[in-house]
Amino acid sequence: TRNHMSQLWKERTYAKRMQRKERHKGKTAGKREEGDTCGAVRSSYGITSAPPMVQVRIGSQQRNLLFDTGADRTIVRWHEGSGNPAGRIKLQGIGGIVEGEKWNNVELEYKGETRKGTIVVLPQSPVEVLGRDNMARFGIKIIMANLEEKRIPITKVKLKEGCTGPHVPQWPLTEEKLKGLTEIIDKLVEEGKLGKAPPHWTCNTPIFCIKKKSGKWRMLIDFRELNKQTEDLTEAQLGLPHPGGLQKKKHVTILDIGDAYFTIPLYEPYREYTCFTLLSPNNLGPCKRYYWKVLPQGWKLSPSVYQFTMQEILEDWIQQHPEIQFGIYMDDIYIGSDLEIKKHREIVKDLANYIAQYGFTLPEEKRQKGYPAKWLGFELHPQTWKFQKHTLPELTKGTITLNKLQKLVGELVWRQSIIGKSIPNILKLMEGDRELQSERKIEEVHVKEWEACRKKLEEMEGNYYNKDKDVYGQLAWGDKAIEYIVYQEKGKPLWVNVVHNIKNLSIPQQVIKAAQKLTQEVIIRTGKIPWILLPGKEEDWRLELQLGNITWMPKFWSCYRGHTRWRKRNIIEEVVEGPTYYTDGGKKNKVGSLGFIVSTGEKFRKHEEGTNQQLELRAIEEALKQGPQTMNLVTDSRYAFEFLLRNWDEEVIKNPIQARIMEIAHKKDRIGVHWVPGHKGIPQNEEIDKYISEIFLAKEGEGILPKREEDAGYDLICPEEVTIEPGQVKCIPIELRLNLKKSQWAMIATKSSMAAKGVFTQGGIIDSGYQGQIQVIMYNSNKIAVVIPQGRKFAQLILMDKKHGKLEPWGESRKTERGEKGFGSTGMYWIENIPLAEEDHTKWHQDARSLHLEFEIPRTAAEDIVNQCEICKEARTPAVIRGGNKRGVNHWQVDYTHYENIILLVWVETNSGLIYAEKVKGESGQEFRIKVMHWYALFGPESLQSDNGPAFAAEPTQLLMQYLGVKHTTGIPWNPQSQAIVERAHQLLKSTLKKFQPQFVAVESAIAAALVAINIKRKGGLGTSPMDIFIYNKEQKRINNKYNKNSQKIQFCYYRIRKRGHQESGKDQPRYCGKGKEPIVVKDIESEKYLVIPYKDAKFIPPPTKEKE
């Protein structure tokens, strides 16, 4: 056994180290070969050419023991009996479990130091070793990684241009936390992972610590500022490996790299930026400063540097072992093979030896040898794979906070690749209030949906990929989602997944989107192009492609008879048999109107609230409701015409009117859709336009009955049982609204049947412009109470023709209109502005106040316009962010913000609220300085405030600001309120941009439209927009500069000082400081004093000229 162990030592790095010494003879000390890099970062060490042996006295005997950091116990072959026997002990060794004698309180002596320790007597041991138990007592450390021959490659990292590193002060910490940090830091310094920072390294990053459940402290570092200033690296690995892409193997081993980050050295020139400070309790001593020598936890580039390093280290080894399936993600390594178990283990051992040369270890206790093996959240079995957690938590009826619901859904979503079921009702619950503590109501439908997923997770298993077989992907329409399954054999899925429905995409378009995602997944995981199975018929898909409804098809595809929920193509751009319905709708006259005229002579019209687009769609909806199974539709709305031809499925349409239209349309046999331009003299189109434009007698509600032609009035119906006390008057509102013609007025009169019982109608005149609810005022003249039952005809409505005559003046002629000095106002003037306001709102989506001020309509009418806008309902303007900010004319704030996948640079003038924004490629200093020149050329600013971002704080930026004469200040670090004005501008711009983006192809155009809406269309309390205020202030400044220049000049005067009884002689040439009707201030040249002189005692003269010498 001894010979076998010595042979192992010779085969490893120690023998290579000896050979290397021979090769390097004669070289200058400290010189490396070209291309060499530094080794793993460790504490100071000495190099030995063989396993280190030391002399230790055990009891009364001197022994030669081997240092072995891999051994827990100190082992000797025999012992003379000193100390206390502690019975038998079982040890786990390479050859299995062995048993030895344990002795406590044995005296040990090493280098003159004596300690009491524990030993194990094992006669059959091939070598006597000093284990970690007693090495710790003597403070002995040995790091085998320092004996490596190969060097870890270094990845260069740097700060962004113009950045100087973080200078964030350390916040106070409790004494308990400082003690915990001191213990952690001392250990890291001993292990060589931290170094003491020199005084001229001024960067600082805050540290703190938390106590783990075990009671130990864990150090945390706030690298946010350093991460912000550090140049990014590309990601070496773009995603997690998936078990569905693994091939089935007989043997697997899962390995974990120990201390992965702490083994890789940090690029030396960068280390000074990682400094941090350990405070001294009560400031009893100076603070201690440290820096990182290795990759720190929490630093944004640690994963990338680690991945690049491992890729470079393992590349050669992987190429030398093509017979295995090898996978690595961060510090987890997967090795699978079909080799014999002995050969498989040899390869694993070879890998451990290989990476040990670089200082990495693969701890034995973290190895998983064989199935089942846990890897990256998955559980691998010989034939199938599962998730490590097989069960989802329960979901019960009742209330749940949004925060808890999000966590539950998160548990499910990442398991979709094995469940493959959609949860539309649960996802719907997450809409609405974004407050994490807001509550949601769980009902039976949600519980059933969740339980179906739980059951599927417990039953479902994934399979492994076979490289010799084709891969298939089958798509199907699920519950408001596209579900697909990837397999090689029927009934044995590799994985499944769900693509939730995408708004405003047809069913075929959604299926193709899911097919693209499926294809991408298969290519990434298996390297093969899958054969896609689409639901439906091949001729349908080929027609969709020809029509241009879809633009991409998989390379290999076919169809299967699946449930597609694909709507029949019954909406066409051709004339079909059946009547033709000419539809129109819009704000034609004060209120919205819609209707249609049929080629058979039928007509329909009604009043309804809504925008022009909504009323156009409602007219089509009414025509479809009342039309036959085969019919033609003609509209002058291009928007409605194109929508109908798209033939979307109602379940994916966001607009409720559009969804209702498609639901009705898909039940018809055939519909021919046609478009004609409006107001072009086309007879039928002009007829329907005129028909709905007329003011017609229209009612809303069921509180009135039709009348016969010979009847005088319309009977009104009592809405509910009403009791009127004797001698009392009661106002009874009924379910009725009227829209009278211009030439009509109405009167509510008493029915004779009610008058006979002593109940009369009082007053009741209805003007032609009135459109509110009808109320009937009843008087009971009896001495007893009267009960009017529900549904009783209790009054009548009589229509009258309106007549209007001018009242001639009495005496002197005067002009006046009711509403200025009369009694009340008719409101006839602002009503005409409502259609204009609505039209303008559909373009720019102003708020109610802006519409109210610009179009001079009532605030309530403006609010109705905004509330009826579908776009404004979805995108509410954000609440105001409060904060102390400097405001002033020509003083600006600037900051970057992210909108979807683009970056915006936003400027805001703090006095007027004027916003200027541009799309930028990134947050680099150079691009920011280019945008500064654009901004300066447009607005001529005086001062600017920004945060401490690298682009703003860079030295070239500061020099540019000085050159332009712009006073530049930065906000308070870690205090978002110092940038409150621009932060609010971000939210306002994003909410406005969301409204305009669907209307434009280019996002730059949407940004420009949003700025018009914010700066020009948005009105303040005095009816002025931000642009109005900005231009006014600029003009005021220009006028002041032009006309007040003389007031700044020095003027001269003679003056006199009045005293009691006489006048004193005047002084000549005092400097003049102020002028006006009030007293003036002058400076006497002789006395150098300032005096206050009445204006009448001063005589102003031109400035004196200097005499020539």
Swiss-Prot record:
Residues 874-1034 form the Integrase catalytic domain. The keyword Amino-acid biosynthesis does not apply. It catalyses: Endohydrolysis of RNA in RNA/DNA hybrids. Three different cleavage modes: 1. sequence-specific internal cleavage of RNA. Human immunodeficiency virus type 1 and Moloney murine leukemia virus enzymes prefer to cleave the RNA strand one nucleotide away from the RNA-DNA junction. 2. RNA 5'-end directed cleavage 13-19 nucleotides from the RNA end. 3. DNA 3'-end directed cleavage 15-20 nucleotides away from the primer terminus; 3'-end directed exonucleolytic cleavage of viral RNA-DNA hybrid; DNA(n) + a 2'-deoxyribonucleoside 5'-triphosphate = DNA(n+1) + diphosphate. It comes from the Viruses. The active site is at D68. Residues 16-29 have a biased composition (Basic residues). Residues 191-380 form the Reverse transcriptase domain. Signal peptide: none annotated. Its EC number is 3.4.23.-, 2.7.7.49, 3.1.26.13, 3.1.13.2. Residues 63-134 form the Peptidase A2 domain. Disulfide bonds: none annotated. Keywords: Aspartyl protease, DNA integration, DNA recombination, DNA-binding, Endonuclease, Hydrolase, Metal-binding, Multifunctional enzyme, Nuclease, Nucleotidyltransferase, Protease, RNA-directed DNA polymerase, Transferase, Viral genome integration, Virus entry into host cell, Zinc, Zinc-finger. Zn(2+) binds at H841, H845, C869, C872. It holds the Pfam family Integrase_Zn. Belongs to the retroviral Pol polyprotein family. This is Pol polyprotein. It comes from Caprine arthritis encephalitis virus (strain Cork) (CAEV-Co).
